[in-house]
Regions:
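Terminal, low-structured helical/coil segments at or just beyond the last alpha-helical repeat
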Residues: 439, 460, 496-519
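Loop-to-helix entry region of an early transmembrane alpha helix in multi-pass inner-membrane enzymes
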Residues: 71-86
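Membrane-interface micro-motifs in multi-pass membrane enzymes
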Residues: 35-38, 53-57, 77, 81, ...
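Start-transfer (signal-anchor) and selected internal transmembrane alpha helices
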Residues: 1-21
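Short hydrophobic alpha-helices at membrane interfaces in multi-pass membrane enzymes
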Residues: 102-112, 146-164, 191-196
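Transmembrane helices and adjacent periplasmic/lumenal helix-loop junctions
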Residues: 120, 129, 149-187, 203-210
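Membrane-interfacial interhelical loops
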Residues: 30-70, 117-129, 207-233
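Soluble catalytic regions of membrane-associated enzymes that act on cell-envelope
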Residues: 235-421, 440-464
């Protein structure tokens, strides 16, 4: 009876771990899954597998990426991740069972501690899933070897077997092999410290000989456990501001504009990234002219930030460029973002957008290269095949120049962007971004987002003369029944020289002036 109770207790604990983790990732943190998925592109090819396992820890990395690709479907990704946490808890529970004479409820609860540590560690957005996969595999292999007695308990034969097995496991899972070594030392009851020290020395010499191209520090701490080379996970947990920005980017990616505006009213993260996301959402709801200064604005970079070589900052600006019709700028920002992924991986999200930009510009040969890559993935394959068929149809029509009537028709996304984009290629500096918005509007007066961004950028820059000069464009091309509230407030502020109580724009101007004086 007691055995049955213990068995049900243990399985009940595992079920609770699975349910808790599933709800955490699917209900509260789906944006964290999306963040991880968008910075890799798992390919279903033999070459990709060989490329991965040619590096130490490559198999764990391959398995981790295999799981992460399913984060594209949130509930499925959350389910697989929850199952991995359950696997971690179960292998630890079995290990404790093998090391103790009896399994008490306290021992079962102790099996939750490594799960909690791994969960908290994964709050660092740069921790890769391969770390957790490697830990599970290390404990699991040690448990199997110990249970079957494959290498014996003591003696030179057992040590020789470990010397052969440890490098093999290292090549599969990376430095997490030392978890295996420690467990085996406990299982075999080795009493001589020189044996473990000698084993470590042999392993270090083998790694230095096999991996001359990698710094020993990186080889010993993992090539694929952390996104940033030669750095280590931070014990930071789930930083509220960081994950709020990740959530906004996730909502932008999925075009959930109402949720962005709602969240912006509840919690603000005072960064240009946050402003870019919120202002883009306002523009898509045609609320930018009315409500822009109801929210925090970081300054001249509140609509579009200048080029920044990291893997996150430029994403909302790239999405804004795409919807404005500044296709080349969107492509440049997405390309720079992809090349800024420090572990050298590709991005499914960026690759898809780059291909779309090439299609809009009529660069079909280069677009096909991106499409061919996406066809080897799981969740981007259907889109890639659809784009390939569309390009073939347009090519067969023998169109010498891109035509909005193709690529899905004039009312398709590609058709609209071809009508809105610049017709000539030229260079511009970030300081002239307001002029670029104005040129977009003159190129196509139906581009209401360009109109909103043009006037908003002048207000952000403090260019009140330009704003007054071009305000009539809002009446002429904006489709407004009355002047937007934000523009009315700005005009009152300008006319009263900022002495307007409760004016959102006046408050913005005063804050900018105070910040500049502080510098």
């Amino acid at each position: 009876m007691k055995k049955a109770v213990k068995r049900y207790w243990n399985w009940g604990l595992s079920v609770l771990v699975g349910i808790g983790m599933f709800l955490f990732w699917y209900v509260w943190y789906p944006h964290a899954l999306s963040y991880q998925e968008q910075y890799q592109l798992f390919l279903w090819t033999g070459d990709y597998f060989v490329e991965k396992i040619s590096l130490p820890g490559g198999f764990a990395d391959w398995v981790g990426e295999f799981i992460v690709q399913f984060y594209y479907v949130e509930w499925l990704g959350a389910l697989l991740l929850a199952m991995l946490f359950v696997a971690l808890q179960r292998v630890i529970l079995r290990l404790l069972n093998s090391l103790t004479s009896h399994l008490s409820p306290l021992t079962s609860i102790l099996s939750l501690l490594p799960v909690a540590v791994m969960w908290w560690l994964m709050g660092d957005i740069n921790v890769m899933l391969s770390l957790m996969v490697a830990v599970v595999m290390a404990i699991g292999i040690a448990g199997i070897v110990g249970k079957l007695g494959l290498l014996g308990r003591v003696g030179s034969l057992g040590i020789a077997g470990e010397i052969v097995l440890v490098p093999m496991i290292y090549w599969l899972i990376g430095p997490a092999v030392w978890i295996y070594v420690i467990i085996r030392v406990i299982q075999t009851g080795w009493r001589q410290l020189w044996t473990a020290g000698w084993l470590v020395a042999v392993q270090l010499m083998v790694y230095a000989w096999l991996l001359p191209q990698w710094p020993l520090q990186q080889a010993m701490t993992g090539l694929s456990y952390y996104r940033i080379p030669l750095q280590y996970p931070q014990w930071s947990g789930y930083d509220k501001d960081m994950y709020e920005l990740i959530r906004l980017d996730y909502l932008v990616r999925n075009e959930r504009w109402d949720e962005i505006v709602k969240r912006a009213g509840e919690y603000q993260v005072k960064t240009p990234f946050w402003c870019n996301c919120v202002n883009l959402a306002l523009s898509q709801k045609r609320l930018l002219a009315d409500r822009m200064f109801d929210f925090y604005q970081s300054g001249e970079d509140a609509l579009i930030i200048p080029r920044t070589r990291d893997l996150t900052s430029m994403l909302p600006s790239a999405e804004a460029f795409w919807r404005l019709g500044m296709v080349n700028s969107a492509q440049r920002y997405m390309f720079d973002t992809q090349e800024s992924i420090l572990n050298g991986k590709k991005s499914g999200r960026c690759t898809k957008r780059i291909a779309e930009c090439m299609i809009v510009n009529g660069h079909y040969q280069t677009a096909r290269k991106q499409i061919d890559i996406l066809k080897k993935s799981l969740f981007y394959r259907s889109w890639a095949e659809e784009m390939e068929a569309m390009i073939e149809a347009e090519t067969e029509a023998d169109q010498t120049t891109p035509n909005p009537s193709y690529s899905g028709g004039e009312n398709s996304v590609f058709g609209k962007l071809r009508k809105m984009r610049y017709k000539e290629s030229f260079l511009y500096s970030y300081e002239e971004i307001d002029k670029m918005f104005g040129l977009l509007l003159m190129n196509n007066t139906d581009n209401k987002m360009a109109l909103d961004y043009f006037l908003a950028q002048m207000l952000l820059n403090g260019n009140v003369q330009g704003f007054q000069q071009y305000l009539g464009l809002a009446q002429q091309y904006g489709g407004y029944r009355q002047m937007p509230l934000g523009y009315q407030d700005a005009m009152r502020c300008i006319q009263a020289q900022g002495n307007v109580a409760g004016s959102p724009y006046a408050n913005y101007v005063k804050r900018m002036m105070a910040e500049r004086r502080g510098k």
